[in-house]
Amino acid sequence: METHLKAPESSLESYNEPSSCTSEQGVTAQELAKQGEELLSQLHRPLEACTNSCYCKQCSFHCQLCFLKKGLGIWYARKSRRRRTPRKTKTHSSSASDKSISTRTGDSQPTKEQKKTTETTMVTTCSLGR
């Protein structure tokens, strides 16, 4: 039982004729080459002044100068520094000068009375266990 598969004649004819895909590929390759040449010519042109002040995506990429200024976010101009507001003077500074230095900065060594109170609180807290 041998069955021979016979290809339809129309399919054989399509093999002999040049396909339309190859001609389309040639056209697209030519278009790409033209676009590449156009891009290169634009790249080598000097930058022209652009007065567009919009920062939307479309305007940031519409020319090389806008891309360098807006798209990359690089500014070569000198930035102005923000001035800080002067600190407000305290109205209670005279009362602070009356106090001794140790009370303003805090005592690093507790006095005898403070030691006694801390010891008694520790003793009472320790005895509250189970």
UniProtKB/Swiss-Prot annotation:
Chief place where the protein resides: host cell
Pfam families (UniProt xref): Tat
Intracellular or extracellular location(s): Host nucleus, Host nucleolus
GO biological process, one term: positive regulation of viral transcription
GO molecular function: RNA binding; RNA-binding transcription regulator activity
Keywords: Activator, AIDS, Host nucleus, Host-virus interaction, Phosphoprotein, RNA-binding, Transcription, Transcription regulation
Segments forming a coiled coil: none
Sites of Phosphoserine modification: 94
Purpose of the protein: Transcriptional activator that increases RNA Pol II processivity, thereby increasing the level of full-length viral transcripts. Recognizes a hairpin structure at the 5'-LTR of the nascent viral mRNAs referred to as the transactivation responsive RNA element (TAR) and recruits the cyclin T1-CDK9 complex (P-TEFb complex) that will in turn hyperphosphorylate the RNA polymerase II to allow efficient elongation. The CDK9 component of P-TEFb and other Tat-activated kinases hyperphosphorylate the C-terminus of RNA Pol II that becomes stabilized and much more processive.
Quaternary structure and interacting proteins, as annotated: Interacts with host CCNT1. Associates with the P-TEFb complex composed at least of Tat, P-TEFb (CDK9 and CCNT1), TAR RNA, RNA Pol II. Interacts with CCNT2; the resulting complex is unable to bind to TAR RNA.
Protein name as it appears in the record: Protein Tat
Annotated source species: Human immunodeficiency virus type 2 subtype A (isolate Ghana-1)
Gene that produces this protein: tat
